[in-house]
Curated annotation (Swiss-Prot):
Organism superkingdom: Bacteria
Matching InterPro entries: T_IF-3_C_sf, T_IF-3_N_sf, Translation_initiation_fac_3, Translation_initiation_fac_3_C, Translation_initiation_fac_3_N
Protein name: Translation initiation factor IF-3
Protein biosynthesis listed as a keyword: yes
Protein's GO biological process: ribosome disassembly
Function summary: IF-3 binds to the 30S ribosomal subunit and shifts the equilibrium between 70S ribosomes and their 50S and 30S subunits in favor of the free subunits, thus enhancing the availability of 30S subunits on which protein synthesis initiation begins.
Any one GO MF annotation of this record: translation initiation factor activity
Entry GO terms, CC: cytosol
Matches recorded under HAMAP family: IF_3
Keyword annotations from UniProtKB, A to Z: Cytoplasm, Initiation factor, Protein biosynthesis
Location in or out of the cell: Cytoplasm
Organism: Pseudomonas aeruginosa (strain ATCC 15692 / DSM 22644 / CIP 104116 / JCM 14847 / LMG 12228 / 1C / PRS 101 / PAO1)
SUPFAM superfamilies: Translation initiation factor IF3, C-terminal domain, Translation initiation factor IF3, N-terminal domain
């Protein structure tokens, strides 16, 4: 019995552009190493100019007529591209959702501590999930919980905007606050 396996290819990997002798066009629009346009030349002339400069001839745009090629150091070009992608990935921050739990009888001191933490989360660019849990007979006084969440919303108006208004899920009231966009 023969088991056929599929070869997995990395979907992110882009095909490399044709380089030097691998370019199939007879004529190309050439851009020099300095970025200046040389004009339309034969492929042999373009490869000769690239070899004189001790650089590579790289096909930039195969769709154009004639194809656009550039004289450059291809290895250095790949390195710079990889470096830029790494910097972009490093600078990309994933916003997390941080949760703070309240109770209907949360005292003023505890409220202020939790509020400070919410301010810190929002100023760091994270979303904040404010949950208020009811126990036992506290469910009969849901309006106290709503008042507390309205107070939290009012206290955080300069740091964030309410993304999800207070909503009762089982024995919990929940609200999500997103940080304000920086200008």
């Amino acid at each position: 019995m023969i088991i056929k396996r599929e070869m997995r290819q990395d979907k992110r990997a882009q095909p490399k552009p044709p380089i030097n002798e691998n370019i199939s066009a007879r004529e190309v629009r050439l851009i020099g190493a300095d970025g200046q346009q040389v004009g339309v030349v034969s492929i042999d002339e373009a490869i000769r100019l690239a070899e004189e400069a001790k650089l590579d001839l790289v096909e930039i745009s195969a769709d154009a007529v004639p194809p656009v090629c550039r004289i450059m150091d291809y290895g250095k070009h790949l390195f710079e591209k990889k470096k830029q992608a790494a910097v972009a990935k490093k600078n990309q921050k994933q916003a997390q959702v941080k949760e703070i739990k309240f109770r209907p009888g949360t005292e003023e001191g505890d409220y202020q501590v939790k509020l400070r933490n919410l301010v810190r989360f929002l100023s760091e660019g994270d979303k904040a999930k404010v949950s208020l849990r009811f126990r036992g007979r506290e469910m009969a006084h849901q309006e106290l919980g709503m008042e507390l969440l309205k107070r939290v919303e009012a206290d955080l108006v300069e740091y964030g905007t309410v993304e999800q208004h207070p909503k009762l899920e089982g024995r919990q009231l929940m609200m999500v606050i997103a940080p304000k966009k920086k200008k």
